[in-house]
Amino acid sequence: MKAEIFYHKIVAIAAQPPAERRNSLVGLHTEVVTPYLNAVRAMTAQDAGRVSSDNRTLGQVVGHIAEWERFSILAVGEIITGVRWPQIMNLSGYVEPDGQVCEFSSIDAFNDYQASKHAAWSWEQIQNLAIQTAAILQILFAHPSLVSWERLEQTKAYRWQLPNEMSVMVSCGWYLWMVTLEHEAVEHALDLGIVEP
């Protein structure tokens, strides 16, 4: 999806009443995740080894998206249990599969950590993680009893600065959902071949 179209959709969705906003995001999530997953499934190990526009391999870029989605799954668990400011908002509470809890000083520190980790992974491992996390996150957000609009609304307010001096003020639960979609639809779309240059 072209960035301009995506951000205009986000601004329009953010202005909707919460119940309608939730339905719109479920639809946008489906619209965004399908081409992302198609690109991930079609990527070969050779493709994954190519260098992206930010000097990571495409495999590391996909791994990076998957790890942010994994972190978001942890955050959604917190939101479901009533946490108003999930740890992801402070870059803390990231739990490795072995139980190690990590905190990061910056987004770049998180990204560098994941790039180093995925440099040692096979493409098959990264691909499986990406497919699983994208599917799980979509299922969680789409489930109205688990991630209801009321639960998203109860989280603390957050102003998301968008390109071209646009911004939206939503609760951080909504923001986490929207930024997940931005990651799949816009941020790495050119590298993954999801949109034409």
Regions found by a protein language model. Give the residues of each.
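Terminal targeting/low-complexity segments that flank the catalytic cores of oxidoreductases
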Residues: 1-35
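Short, contiguous alpha-helical
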Residues: 1-13, 47-106, 139-197
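Domain-scale detector for complete catalytic domains at protein termini or as standalone homologs
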Residues: 26, 30-34, 124-127, 131, ...
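Acidic/histidine-rich alpha-helical segments that form the ligand environment
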Residues: 28, 32, 97-151
